[in-house]
Each structure stands twice: as C-alpha cells, then as structure tokens.
Swiss-Prot record:
Pfam families tied to this protein: UPF0102
Full protein name: UPF0102 protein RPA0323
Matching SUPFAM superfamilies: Restriction endonuclease-like
Annotated GO MF terms: nucleic acid binding
Taxonomic lineage from the root: Bacteria, Pseudomonadati, Pseudomonadota, Alphaproteobacteria, Hyphomicrobiales
Domain of life: Bacteria
PANTHER family referenced in this protein's UniProt entry, alphabetically: UPF0102 PROTEIN YRAN (PTHR34039:SF1)
Annotated source species: Rhodopseudomonas palustris (strain ATCC BAA-98 / CGA009)
Family of this protein: Belongs to the UPF0102 family.
C-alpha cells in the first residue's frame, strides 16, 4: 500500500489560497483604477505586516486590504482588529519610505471580493487609532 503524504492537501490548499488572493488583488486594483485611483504599490511587505494595495486619488492615499471569501459578509468579517493593527504598522513603514505622501489625506479601506458579485469598496473601513 502506498504511503500518503498528509501535508499535501495543506500545501495544495495554501497554493489555491495564494492564487485566489492574487486574483482578488488584481480585481480590486482594476476596480480602483476604474474609479480614478492610481496604484502606487501592490503587496507591500514589512516584517510587521503587509498592505495589499496602496492607491492614490488626488490628495488621498488609501491603504487597501483585499478580502476574498465565498460571500461578502464573510469577507467583511475577515479583517480582524489584529490584522488592522498590522496594516497600520505596514502603512507607517510605507510612508517612511515615501515621505512625499506624508502630508496626504490617509485612509484605510477594504475591498471585498466574492463570487458572482462586483467588488465592494469600503472607504474608511477602519482607522489608525488603537
């Protein structure tokens, strides 16, 4: 009898989740561009957190968390307070590397992606206060 590798489904699930995330982020970026935003960064990573998208429209810079789930409600609940604090920390790191945007209006948005629905943009989904 052949020995099965129990870690294989986990690896496949992680690969599928990664691909879903990339696809959702691309859809969100396309949506934002159609709304007049310019994408400044994608998947900005620091040791304290990650920002899916950094987008600018006029004097506004939005740090955007993209969530893809089976339905929009599940996607909305997926942005946890802990994750919000990590995104805020990553935004501070991004701003330190891009001081030209330090005087911009800053906002933390979410874009929710679910099958068979248009992306749902939540401007100001959370703020930087603890």
């Amino acid at each position: 009898m052949a020995k099965t590798d129990r870690s294989q489904p986990s690896v496949l699930a992680r690969i599928a989740a990664f691909r879903t995330g990339l696809s959702a982020e691309a859809s969100a970026a396309d949506y934002l561009e159609r709304q007049g935003y310019r994408i400044l960064a994608r998947r900005f990573k620091t040791r304290c957190g990650e920002i899916d998208l950094v987008a600018q429209r006029d004097a506004l810079v939005a740090f955007v968390e993209v969530k893809a789930r089976g339905n929009v409600d599940d996607a909305a609940y997926a942005v946890t307070p802990r994750q919000q604090s990590r995104i805020v920390a990553a935004a501070e790191a991004w701003l330190s590397r891009h001081p030209e945007h330090a005087m911009s209006e800053l906002r933390f948005d979410a874009i929710l992606i679910a099958p068979n629905t248009a992306p749902r943009h939540l401007p100001g989904a959370f703020d930087a206060t603890p």
